[in-house]
Regions:
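Protein kinase-like catalytic core scaffold
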Residues: 81-83, 139-141, 151
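Catalytic cores of nucleic-acid endonucleases
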Residues: 2, 16, 28, 89-148
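Short hydrophobic/aromatic patches at helix-to-coil boundaries
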Residues: 153-157
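Acidic-basic catalytic patches of nuclease active cores, encompassing PD-(D/E)XK
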Residues: 1-63
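Conserved catalytic cores of phosphodiester-cleaving nucleases, focusing on short active-site segments
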Residues: 53, 72-98, 110
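Short acidic/glycine-enriched loop/turn segments that link adjacent beta-strands
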Residues: 67-70, 147-148
Length: 157
């Protein structure tokens, strides 16, 4: 049989609609309700974890600290111990527990971001920087928020 070189089009169809740029431009780029709920849940969980640390005598040093190598959710300090906490929030266990989401790759990113965080404060005389620089130990915690329940896993990696 004969195979045409051009796609078969109706007389009213335009070639313009075949371009990939047009198809990409037509996608919906707005934030979905589920994405907005996820962001709100994450912020609520970070607020909950920050309050937990404060109630236990820690000073919150930083929240959502960003660098090229990652993000630190909550950084706190107490008794010369710098605590870096990765916060994982889930509405349910349907896709695994919050702790299971902290993979070895994520742990490495957090460790590298922590090194960048400490380096960024080395030369500073800011009171927070002095507190961070006086820390002799770094501890990595994971805060698991499932629904409204908080479980703290201290010194987990």
């Amino acid at each position: 049989g004969h195979v045409p070189h051009e796609p078969i089009r109706s007389a009213r169809e335009s070639v313009e609609f075949q371009r990939p740029q047009h198809r990409r431009a037509a996608t919906n780029r707005s934030v979905t309700a589920s994405a907005a709920a996820r962001v709100a849940r994450g912020k609520w969980a970070e607020d909950l974890v920050s309050r937990w640390y404060q109630q236990h005598g820690y000073v919150i040093v930083a929240r959502n600290w960003l660098c090229k190598r990652g993000e630190l959710d909550v950084v706190a300090c107490k008794d010369a111990v710098l605590v870096v906490c990765e916060v994982k929030a889930r509405a349910s266990n349907a896709f695994g527990t919050p702790a299971e989401a902290v993979t070895p790759a994520k742990q490495l990113k957090v460790r590298r971001a922590t090194a960048d965080f400490r380096q960024s404060l080395r030369a500073s005389s800011d009171p927070i920087a002095l507190l961070v620089n006086s820390a002799r130990t770094v501890r990595f915690d994971v805060a698991c928020v499932l629904g409204t329940q908080l479980e703290m896993l201290e010194d987990i990696f």
